[in-house]
Amino acid sequence: MSFDLAARLAERQAADLFRQRPLLQTPQGPQVRADDQELLAFCSNDYLGLANHPEVIRALQLGAEKWGVGGGASHLVIGHSTPHHELEEALAEFTGRPRALLFSTGYMANLAVVTALLGQGDSVLQDRLNHASLLDAGLLCGARFSRYLHNDAVSLANRLRKASGNCLVVTDGVFSMDGDLADLPVLCAEARARDAWVMVDDAHGFGPLGATGGGIVEHFGLGLDEVQVLVGTLGKAFGTAGAFVAGSEELIETLIQFARPYIYTTSQPPAVACATLKSLELLRREGWRREHLQRLIARFRQGAAEIGLSLMDSPTPIQPILVGDSARALKLSALLKDRGLLVGAIRPPTVPAGSARLRVTLSAAHSEAQLELLLEALAECWPQVQADA
């Protein structure tokens, strides 16, 4: 019996859920060329505008000249280079934790933590809107897996009472498709009352949130006692690639010994670690980037309200415009593209059915004038989409 892949693909196309990759023909930045069209992009996760920063580029070049290109082997064989080690130490200091551990991707970091800490007889409790990598990790770890209602401490408490064995509460810090924040103080209090650990994937919080860009944990003034496992990615606000886990000495050593996605993966190129060290320096030195970004967020939300757009409750650079129907979301995205603006339509299964949206993301690299162009285009296009409702 053959795999009927053609039927699966046709079904997805018929439901307006078929996804295609835009071909980027320039570096990351507000002004890009994609699919042979000059566009003003509002869909990148380069929140602080560091992905194409000349100092970061130069650090990568110098790193490649000194350390070569490939990692060569896994960290435990001979792939753990000095730049990797220096970056881990810098990230530990940045997060205020004893140690940090580098991973090649955020997906691998999340998979590594959950599968290394939990097994049969244990419990993992996750927010219903967590990132796919966290949900996959919960399914693969062998523990009892339960999802609590989004950001709902009462729902979490009910599940904590039924938990057995070692219990890990897992949440996004900033929810990637909604832009809202996890209510960490309340969630951590519930977990602590039941002797459970808390793991936060702050992929979208590091950089934009916190007085020094330290993310949602810094934003709420929490520490290692409240959030035992802190995960961050380096391909978003840091503008480079990879991810890290920060925590106690015992946590990091446990991951080195037992986390299969860490043990059996070639290390990232050491030159990338050199670039990330520079981007971390810029993130901490240039506070104006966060300040400018906050002004853009405030202006976008004000302008969107004037247009009558349905926004979600987000204080972050992620500003989703809720459309509902997938076909209408695609139409709004296409209308904007006709006007030289690139904003992606996010549809099921990435988001729940009936909640298709345009995921506007803002960057410190955007100017106020560029943001006004987006608002003007939305004011023109939104009535056309509403007419199809």
Curated annotation (Swiss-Prot):
Protein EC: 2.3.1.47
Record's catalysed reaction(s): 6-carboxyhexanoyl-[ACP] + L-alanine + H(+) = (8S)-8-amino-7-oxononanoate + holo-[ACP] + CO2
Needed co-factor(s): pyridoxal 5'-phosphate
Binding-site positions, pyridoxal 5'-phosphate: 106-107, 176, 204, 233
Modified residues (N6-(pyridoxal phosphate)lysine): 236
Keywords: Biotin biosynthesis, Pyridoxal phosphate, Transferase
Residues holding substrate: 19, 131, 350
One example GO MF annotation: 8-amino-7-oxononanoate synthase activity
Gene3D superfamilies: Aspartate Aminotransferase, domain 1 (3.90.1150.10), Type I PLP-dependent aspartate aminotransferase-like (Major domain) (3.40.640.10)
GO BP field: biotin biosynthetic process
A Pfam family hit: Aminotran_1_2
Pathway assignment: Cofactor biosynthesis; biotin biosynthesis
Matches recorded under InterPro entries: Aminotrans_II_pyridoxalP_BS (IPR001917), Aminotransferase_I/II_large (IPR004839), AON_synthase_class-II (IPR050087), AONS_Archaea/Proteobacteria (IPR004723), AONS_Proteobacteria (IPR022834), PyrdxlP-dep_Trfase (IPR015424), PyrdxlP-dep_Trfase_major (IPR015421), PyrdxlP-dep_Trfase_small (IPR015422)
Role this protein plays: Catalyzes the decarboxylative condensation of pimeloyl-[acyl-carrier protein] and L-alanine to produce 8-amino-7-oxononanoate (AON), [acyl-carrier protein], and carbon dioxide.
Subunit structure: Homodimer.
Family label: Belongs to the class-II pyridoxal-phosphate-dependent aminotransferase family. BioF subfamily.
HAMAP family in the record: BioF_aminotrans_2 (MF_01693)
UniProt name for this protein: 8-amino-7-oxononanoate synthase
Organism of derivation: Ectopseudomonas mendocina (strain ymp)
